Design a protein with these regions (language model features):
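Conserved NTP-donor binding/palm subdomain of two-metal-ion nucleotidyltransferases/polymerases, i.e.
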Residues: 1-124, 130-333
Length: 333
């Protein structure tokens, strides 16, 4: 059995083999190596949800079942804590009279009705964008409410795209952004995310979230920040979940930003988008012709699995494995 192909086919948002065939294959799938691969790729909630959809979770390898279930529940509990923090902050910003737009993971979780499975990924913190001329006042107001800096030893970075991270009693990191990236002017970031954004309501609390174009772009740009570990399923997820939903994306604007080198390594971006498209199960639009290149996800996962059958790398070795396998996946196409 090709375990790498099985994982890829199971996680793909569209297309792929029939559910009955996947279910049969999972009954005979190897346990420990796949556990290590899922851990390496950061896709435990995603896999857990898909195995439940297939109705096969209780028929997979017992150790894999126990591990993926426990890991998914642990990460989901963390996500719920972050949701509670976002709800509290939304109320705080309303009381302060400060407009704000929630970014990244929180925004995806708030829009799961528009982007199915968008909440099937661990979220690490709360990122929120506010007007640049109000950011410092908002940050200080949070400090007066009991929030503390997460790292007192870090030197201030006035040029950074967010103020020093804070955390309250929930111990969830909160980053107050003035822009989404250092190469984007604050006023432009506000236009892209807030002005073009949309309101959503949860449990009587109103939030502002970015449009599909910005969620797609931020997933791509954020994923490619560190090229040596950019080609992981958990990072492809952020763009693939938007792509697979069929939500309208301004592809001409995506091309313009690639041409403007908002992502410096355009070649890597083309391969990364090719991988995200395969995972989404979609054909890239004509606007991306010549920009998106094919990426052999099955080869990448297969090479990683070969190593992970023997040992579980960490630190620099983990980064080296991620980088080497991604280079091999790009070289054969």
């Amino acid at each position: 059995m090709n375990s790498a192909r099985l994982l890829l086919d199971t996680l793909r948002f569209r297309g792929g083999p029939p559910a009955e065939r996947l279910a049969t294959d999972w009954e005979h799938a190897e346990g420990t190596p796949l556990q290590r691969l899922v851990e390496f790729e950061g896709c435990s909630i995603w896999l857990y949800r898909r195995l439940r959809q297939l109705g096969v979770l209780d028929r997979v390898d017992p150790e894999l079942n126990d591990w993926v279930s426990a890991k998914a529940h642990e990460e989901t509990a963390r996500n719920l804590l972050i949701e509670a923090e976002a709800e509290s902050l939304a109320t705080t910003f309303r009381d302060l009279g400060t407009p704000a737009v929630f970014l990244k993971g929180v925004a995806r979780r708030l829009t799961v009705d528009r982007y199915p499975l968008a909440d099937a990924r661990v979220t690490n913190d709360v990122d929120v964008l506010v007007p640049v001329d109000q950011a410092r006042d908002v940050w200080r107001a949070l400090c007066r409410m009991g929030y503390e800096r997460t790292n007192l030893n870090a030197a201030p970075r006035p040029e950074h795209h967010h103020l020093p991270a804070l955390c309250g009693w929930r111990r969830v990191a909160v980053e107050v952004h003035t822009t989404n990236a250092q190469e984007v002017a604050p006023e432009e970031a506000w236009r892209r995310h807030y002005v073009a954004g949309m309101d959503v309501e949860r449990a009587g609390v109103r939030y502002r979230v970015p449009p599909a174009t910005e969620l797609f772009w931020s997933g791509t740009a954020h994923g490619l920040r560190h090229p040596e570990i950019a080609f992981l399923l958990v990072l492809f997820f952020d763009a693939a979940v938007i792509w697979a939903s069929g939500a309208p994306v301004d592809w001409a604007e995506i091309v313009r930003r690639l041409d403007a080198k908002e992502i410096v390594d355009r070649t890597a971006a083309g391969a990364w988008l090719g991988a995200a498209a395969e995972l989404a199960g979609v054909e890239p639009p004509a606007a991306l012709d010549g920009l998106v290149t094919r990426y052999d996800l099955e080869r990448e996962l297969g090479l990683r699995l070969t190593v992970l059958r023997r040992f579980r790398p960490s630190g620099a070795l983990r980064k080296a494995l991620a980088w080497w396998t991604s280079e091999r996946a790009r070289a054969v196409v």
